[in-house]
Amino acid sequence: MKNEHNKNLDRRDFLKVLGGAAAVTSATLLPGCKNKQESAYTATTDIPTDQMTYRINPSTQDRVSLLGYGCMRWPTVSNNSARDSNDDIDQETVNKLVDVAIAHGVNYFDTSPAYCKGRSERATGIALNRYPRDKYFIATKLSNFAPSTWSREASIAMYHNSFKELQVNYIDYLLLHGVGMGNGLQEFNARYIDNGVLDFLLAERQAGRIRNLGFSYHGDIK
């Protein structure tokens, strides 16, 4: 696909290019710990571990949990949210939260280079790397919101860093983050089209380093 064609993508063409695998990001569906005595992971014995609902991804046949775990607000050592606090992430608690999620059938974890002030991918990767790679699905994003990250080089560097932080050699679901935000189509083109980044990601998908390529959307549906 040539960049010249990309500049004229409409919504239908865009969805076709992504192969119908446009993904919706999960909310943070399991709570962080309120305090050391009232931890989310103490509920392990109270919740059935065999009643998760799954959906089959028609493109890959992945059996994905209907409930996903959003990793935007990992807890800190001071029991705050790492989204708002610069305190260290409480990795021990993150590990236990992930353990509870997996024990109860959750296998889809959604993160981003932007979450937790840039620390979510690393904490998520540490927690998940304790499990066999085929036991979970990682969704992360190309979160190149700032104009300083719009160049091809900066965007690709962000993409490669996600592999390092997550400790993986492929990403299950890679999302173009927050399309529709900012200055609409003009900003979208600057982030993904004019710089050739979408073409690069399509090649990465072809090579198997991205299993599903999609986007998250926070704008007006019209």
Predicted stretch roles:
Residues 1-10:
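N-terminal secretory signal peptides
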Residues 9-30:
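N-terminal export leaders
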Residues 30-68, 81:
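C-terminal segment of N-terminal export signals and the immediately downstream linker at the start
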Residues 57, 69, 109, 124, ...:
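Conserved, mostly hydrophobic/aromatic
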Residues 58-61, 125-133, 164-167:
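Acidic (Asp/Glu)-rich catalytic clusters
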Residues 71-89:
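Acidic/histidine-rich helix-loop elements
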Residues 78, 149-222:
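Glycine/proline-rich, positively charged
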Residues 111-127, 185:
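Glycine-rich, proline-tolerant flexible connector loops at the mouths of alpha/beta enzymes
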